[in-house]
Swiss-Prot record:
Predominant location: plastid
Protein name in the entry: Chloroplast envelope membrane 70 kDa heat shock-related protein
Claim: Membrane is one of the keywords in the record: yes
GO biological process, one term: chaperone cofactor-dependent protein refolding
An annotated Gene Ontology molecular function: ATP binding
Assigned GO CC terms: chloroplast membrane; cytoplasm
Function statement: Sce70 may play a role in the transport of polypeptides across the envelope membrane and into the chloroplast.
């Protein structure tokens, strides 16, 4: 339950390319717009010589600052640096990714003239902080509690890393829920009035960087996931990459120039390709057009929808494999699926829709929910349920999700012994008794794996721990009880107990592949606070600078005004003009001064200008400026209402 004074609980869809935030208010979900008026916020973080930018501001300057603008952190989170997908992505990324402690991918940027390294969790935490601030600005109160979504096919380490990102951002992550399950909630509430009896629903969720398929049965508010499948490295970004590679070859063919892969050129090309891809969802042909792409040469290349489909057809077909796997795992025939629901921006691609419709023998696809907002919508509903804020319409909803991958441990000969098969409903707890492999064995090494292969070397090692102090005895005699316990977030705890001695040991899977320690998380929390206060200082500095600039130029306009200028003595006029010129000159040479320096200059200028302007108003007997007689300036308050209004307006520059 959310504590008092913590504000409403929010739902955050932390996407690869875009993120969204929703809240349950007035018996409905509100997807909240950011300060630019957009309901989607780019999952981008940029670092410059003077500040850190997050969201739209970061994405808008990416072409000018590609090597210090970070995106796609979700494709790095919870992975090893040596993972094939991490290595493959590096050629498409302008920013630097290096191997950190425990093979953790670290992102290298230049921030305020210094080389810095950030973990993917830290970048994701910055995006989460931005989403939290968007919600706080809308709600007018602080927000502490959130439900955050992850792809259904995220493994244990990716889920735990996402939870860590929430902690670093200062959020209490009440629950990690699967994106297709969240979308199913949006679908279920949309259909609640008209739905009767049990329905089998397939959620097809193809986003910017990840792909999930989940099959659920929905009946009277109970959402039971039967099976899930997917690919945590397939989405719109991959379709963009194909277009970028195609365009590079086109440019080389037409101009006999090989674009040196300088980040700025590639970034401009990628932005144009992404725009073309979106256009091709609604038209049959478009043009990729970039002025002066490389060495002054313009790039102009028409592209048809058919060509785009040809470039990506293998990836589009690959999207159908998890659909088949999901139906197989759920032991369900495709004819028994009542609705196929499209979620994620990439489901707008006509060829993807056509392949899916053909697979389901021409069945009409369900497009009644917003594919971009459905996940955040479901997360906001779940947040309301967990914090006790929702009405009776949502409080009786029950989510029964599953674990996407089989979990087990290594037994003699490197065999994977499964304790929890994939698609087991969570939370769940399974126990099994094991024994020793050799005589007088003093301890056992328990190695925990996830995956579907029979040999552990082909699966993913999550973590390991030792149970020592086993009394000497023949092989097969000691009894070691191993317990696997998965919580509602899909995060695994493993414990082992020697039944003879009562000796116990346990592990919350903090795998060996770069999971953050408690100390590292604490350090990152402190750094996040530091960056936040630096951002606030920068904002204050800009506001103080703008205030001084506006005041100086406004005073100059007032003095130059013939009606007002005529009322000033030559000495006063000269005094004000000299003070204004000195301030403007100081501003030009001190753009990087601190906020208090701008404030001091402001006070200095006001102390010269205000008394003269006040004297002029009094001398005019209040007959100036149309009814401003009671609004005379006071020291430190600006010269009359016109100036005060202008000082306020500086916030909009």
């Amino acid at each position: 339950m959310a504590g008092k004074g913590e504000g409403p609980a929010i739902g955050i869809d932390l996407g690869t390319t875009y993120s969204r935030v929703g809240v349950w208010q007035h018996d409905r979900v509100e997807i909240i717009a950011n300060d630019q008026g957009n309901r989607t916020t780019p999952s981008y973080v940029a670092f410059t010589d003077s500040e850190r930018l997050i969201g739209d501001a970061a994405k808008n300057q990416v072409a000018m600052n590609p090597i210090n603008t970070v995106f796609d952190a979700k494709r790095l989170i919870g992975r090893r640096f040596s993972d094939a997908s991490v290595q493959a992505d590096m050629k498409h990324r302008p920013f630097k990714v290096v191997s950190g402690p425990g093979e953790k991918p670290m992102i290298g940027v230049n921030y305020k003239g210094e080389e810095k390294q950030f973990a993917a969790e830290e970048i994701s935490s910055m995006v989460l902080t931005k989403m939290k601030e968007i919600a706080e600005a809308y709600l007018g109160s602080t927000v502490k509690n959130a439900v955050v979504t992850v792809p259904a096919y995220f493994n244990d380490s990716q889920r735990q890393a996402t939870k860590d990102a929430g902690v670093i951002s200062g959020l209490n992550v009440m629950r990690i829920i699967n994106e297709p399950t969240a979308a199913a909630i949006a679908y279920g509430l949309d259909k609640k009035a008209t739905s009767v009896g049990e329905k089998n629903v397939l959620i097809f969720d193809l986003g910017g960087g990840t792909f999930d398929v989940s099959l659920l049965t929905i009946e009277e508010g109970i959402f039971e996931v039967k099976a899930t499948a997917g690919d945590t490295h397939l989405g719109g970004e991959d379709f963009d990459n194909r277009m970028v590679n195609h365009s590079l070859q086109e440019f080389k063919r037409k101009n006999k120039k090989d674009i040196m892969e300088t980040p700025g050129h590639i970034r401009r090309l990628r932005t144009a390709c992404e725009r073309a891809k979106r256009t091709l969802s609604s038209t049959a042909q478009t043009t990729i057009e970039i002025d002066s792409l490389y060495e002054g040469v313009d790039f102009y290349s028409p592209i048809t929808r058919a060509r785009f489909e040809e470039l990506n057809i293998d990836l589009f077909r690959k999207c159908m494999e998890p659909v088949e796997k999901c139906l197989r795992d759920a032991k369900m025939d495709k004819s028994t699926v009542h609705d196929v629901v499209l979620v994620g921006g990439s489901t707008r691609i006509p060829k993807v829709q056509q392949l899916l419709q053909d697979f389901f023998n021409g069945k009409e696809l369900c497009k009644s929910i917003n594919p971009d907002e459905a996940v955040a919508y479901g997360a906001a509903v779940q947040a309301a349920i967990l914090s006790g804020e929702g009405n009776e319409k949502v409080q009786d909803l029950l989510l029964l999700d599953v674990t996407p991958l089989s979990l087990g441990l290594e037994t003699a000969g490197g065999v994977m012994t499964v304790l929890i098969p994939r698609n087991t409903t969570i939370p769940t707890k399974k126990e099994q008794v094991f024994s020793t492999y050799s005589d007088n064995q003093p301890g056992v090494l328990i190695q925990v794996y996830e995956g579907e292969r029979t040999r552990t070397r082909d699966n993913n090692l999550l973590g390991k721990f030792e149970l020592s102090g086993i009394p000497p005895g023949p092989r097969g005699v000691p009894q070691i009880n191993v317990c696997f316990d998965i919580d509602a977030n899909g995060i695994l705890n493993v414990s082992a107990e020697d039944k003879t001695t009562g000796q116990k040991n346990k592990i919350r899977i903090t795998n060996d592949k770069g999971r953050l320690s408690k100390e590292e998380i604490e350090k990152m929390v402190q750094e996040a606070e530091k960056y936040k206060s630096e951002d606030e200082e920068h904002k204050k500095k800009v506001e103080s600078k703008n205030a001084l600039e506006n005041y100086a130029y406004n005073m100059r306009n007032i003095v130059k005004d013939e009606k007002i200028g005529a009322k000033l003595s030559e000495a006063d006029k000269k005094k004000i003009e000299e003070a204004i010129d000195a301030s403007i000159q100081w501003l030009d040479g001190n753009q990087l001064a601190e906020a208090d320096e701008f404030d001091d200059k402001m006070k200095e200028l006001e102390s010269i200008c205000n008394p003269i302007i006040a004297k002029m108003y009094q001398g005019a007997g209040g007959d100036m400026g149309g009814g401003m007689e009671d609004e005379g300036p006071t020291s430190g308050g600006g010269a009359g209402p016109k100036i005060e209004e202008c000082r306020l307006s500086c916030h909009f520059f």
